[in-house]
């Protein structure tokens, strides 16, 4: 093992410079949908939630945030496309900054992973394809029940530029709200991933068919956002080997390398590195199911992650079921610069301190992941020794 519990040499607690941002540790809050933004407006409870998980020199990535009225696939997720949303996000960002943390907003369009109930005028969700997500999966409905994903509408070639513009405008809105940067969600079977994966994308235009064509949409989105706010404020998340929501690809490694190649070129042409590349490892748990994708063994997973890590010229964040020990190992072995934690951060608002001390962890309650209660299962998980978000143990 790379480090003992409290030997002072825990690599997760070595400082790191992520471009223009100086981080005091390498434990990152992963973006996680929590469904507490009533009517798509960030609420005060979100401020408390993120403040609880903020540490001086820490790095937080928000839950997936809608870039347009067509981009929702869960009830009560926040948006960043209206003035009111920007205004309410600014209150949350200010609270996080007061704790000395860095925070990025994850820009999200779910594509076909939606339902008419979430779409303006009850329209069909847009996607790269007309193929619906299979009945293996269910969508969470506003009333808490689970429904079947409907048939999407394949977006017209002429419409794609507007979606790219939605990403660009949302990135500018995020900066207006005070965010330090944004993360483009290109993973987990959502819209960008629906263009990337050959198991979904069946287009015959310039956005489908060849690997180069399937990478065109994500390239245009990244270029547009970089031109708007600067490369050093932009992170990108991808999951080439994950088949969540039927997002399968015949050659995940080639796909991942193709995306990395394009990100490296964007960095070269912009004269500045992106903030980071955030990759979810193949073994990923979502909705209580483990999705191993096409790569199942630990050896295969490690090979894919290391290949992408070595190919990408910049900060590399790994994600997906990491424990304290696996996070230490990833950084110590050079497999990642930063490690993002999801479910462990839900039930342990002071996860950073718990990892530092190798303290016991609270268990999470999956039943409260996607409810609208602003307290239960959201901001009521206990801190070490009963300290609140401003207690001495929550500060590093």
Swiss-Prot record:
It comes from the Eukaryota. This is 12-oxophytodienoate reductase 3. CDD domains: OYE_like_FMN. The keyword Flavoprotein applies. InterPro entries: Aldolase_TIM, OxRdtase_FMN_N, Oye-like. Expressed in roots and to a lower extent in leaves and flowers. A motif (Microbody targeting signal) lies at residues 394-396. Belongs to the NADH:flavin oxidoreductase/NADH oxidase family. GO terms for cellular component: peroxisome. It comes from Solanum lycopersicum (Tomato). It holds the Pfam family Oxidored_FMN.
